[in-house]
Amino acid sequence: MSDIIHLLPDSVANQIAAGEVIQRPASVIKELVENAIDAEAQNIHVLVTDAGKTCIQVIDDGKGMSETDARLSFERHATSKIREASDLFALRTMGFRGEALASIAAVAQVELKTRPESEELGTKIIIAGSKVESQEAVSCPKGSNFSIKNLFFNIPARRKFLKANSTELSNILAEFERIALVHPEVAFSLYSNDSELFNLPACHLRQRILSVFGKKLNQQLLSVEVNTTMVKVSGYVAKPETARKKGAHQYFFVNGRYMRHPYFHKAVMDAYEQLIPAGEQISYFIYFEVDPANIDVNIHPTKTEIKFENEQAIWQILSASIKESLGKFNAVPSIDFDTEDMPDIPAFEQNLPPAPPKVHFNSDFNPFKPSSSSGGGNYSRPKVDWEDLYGGLEKASKMNQPFSDSDPESEEFAVIEEESIATAAPETLYAGELAVIEKGTQHLQFKGRFILTSVKSGLMLIDQHRAHIRVLFDRYRAQIQQKQGFSQGVLFPEILQLPASEAAVLQSIMDDLSAVGFDLSDLGGGSYAINGVPSGIDGLNPVDLVRSMLHTAMEKGNDVKEEIQDILALTLARAAAIVYGQVLSNEEMVSLVDNLFACPSPNYTPDGRVVLTTIKEEEIDKLFR
């Protein structure tokens, strides 16, 4: 039997490794910028073309590399960060595996120019698909200049699955923001297709946060600071009143490295318990400093999942420190006593003797005299107008089963004449049967949530909020497709401030927002003026509405225009729909039901939730047997 096991060529092995380390253009930028930080660079410039698909360039003024180091840096597991296994437990650098450059060179065309400060000439290396094409001396500034062209040029399947430019650029911006937030002492700049997106000078942490996410955040941040023998926790959390359902800026960093940690996220939310509505999120920027020996960063290729040795204790410290900050800055709501209707109590004058209290009594009262109301025999119960409780019910023909004329309850069993709903309603509305609204019926509202109405097969219950979402979704969807949305101008334009990562996504959906009725103008620097909103959304905050649609689009990451249009229509419908608890008149309920049954799919909301259900007449009869 011949041997079948053999070693893979380095180029193939590097491509396999690149599948874990390099997933998209943002991964390349993360690895190169982190290497620049490890090289003690003070200024880092990032330039991308076509969201990094065509070219990524990272320029730094760090230590640079010698000719030998420049060539060796592209070999697998070649690194200057560690020398032995024990160094893994004392890591202070961003990288340590020596895989990044080898992985990048395996799937792209790489050009490196680098020079250490001690040498007059630098080195230029060109590598494509792990093969060194040339290496020569060149004149260049101190530091390193990486140019990554045609990412995944030799793996068409990987390149085909890259997202649209707007999505990939959003991922680049998100990765860039994470690195910039954890290294405020370094100056960063980011350009996309020769357009400047970020220009961040070296500064303090709070100023860096405001430079990335806007100065409006300055009034919302509370500082957090605690130092123990186990961990040092610092950073900022937002005030409770800034909580939102989507779009909160939530960042954890440990020893200068970004991380995701759901367990510590629960600690933050525990500190805000009963301070923010359920389901809403709060912004925070939390920085941990711990002994490197007490954490393990080598459990995931992207190094964003980190294991702590004392997670439970740190959980308690984190939650307590945030609670302390909320109390110290008076962020916890205080008891507000309403003095509007309180009696005016005059100040006590010590010179005057206190007046005795006045007692009112009936001098003619005789407890032994019989009273006409005693004994309870003549007690009359308070009158209850039962007819008002059922005023909305019209009695018509009796039930099919006859009752005796002497039966006093026979007239309570009444039904309402039947009439077909509008022809626009589908023939198979529910369970394959034709739903028929009873003639002349007055719809009833139950608990401010459901609309009850009589149909041919029994009693129909309609969720008023979901029904309105169904109606509005179809309306807004048609407006977006036909670009016939009506815009209503606002007297004072609202200003929307966005970080660069969100602004890039907003630009990609701007046409769809205009189609539904929004009028936005770009003021530059991530600021947008909302000059007009869709008609019919009176009372809604246009800034929150645009943010909601923006963050939904970011979460979905859709590249198909129709799907983005559905997202916009659904978000707008949810925001504008009537809420639970809103009292509706009979005319409003009739209009809502008619519009619902005119929809192509009245049974379900666009996201698949049930809108209506029917209790069959036979099931109701069984309840009275």
Curated annotation (Swiss-Prot):
Q: Which SMART domains match?
A: DNA_mis_repair (SM01340), MutL_C (SM00853)
Any one Gene Ontology molecular-function term assigned to this protein's record? ATP hydrolysis activity
Provide a GO biological process annotation. mismatch repair
List the Gene3D superfamilies: 3.30.230.10, Histidine kinase-like ATPase, C-terminal domain, MutL, C-terminal domain, dimerisation subdomain, MutL, C-terminal domain, regulatory subdomain
Q: Which PROSITE patterns match?
A: DNA_MISMATCH_REPAIR_1
For the keyword Aminoacyl-tRNA synthetase, the answer is no
Keyword field? DNA damage, DNA repair
Pfam families annotated for this entry? Answer: DNA_mis_repair, HATPase_c_3, MutL_C
Which CDD domains does this one have? HATPase_MutL-MLH-PMS-like, MutL_Trans
| Entry GO terms, CC | mismatch repair complex
Q: Give a short account of what the protein does.
A: This protein is involved in the repair of mismatches in DNA. It is required for dam-dependent methyl-directed DNA mismatch repair. May act as a 'molecular matchmaker', a protein that promotes the formation of a stable complex between two or more DNA-binding proteins in an ATP-dependent manner without itself being part of a final effector complex.
Protein family (similarity comment): Belongs to the DNA mismatch repair MutL/HexB family.
The identity of this protein, by name, is DNA mismatch repair protein MutL
The species is Bacteroides fragilis (strain ATCC 25285 / DSM 2151 / CCUG 4856 / JCM 11019 / LMG 10263 / NCTC 9343 / Onslow / VPI 2553 / EN-2)
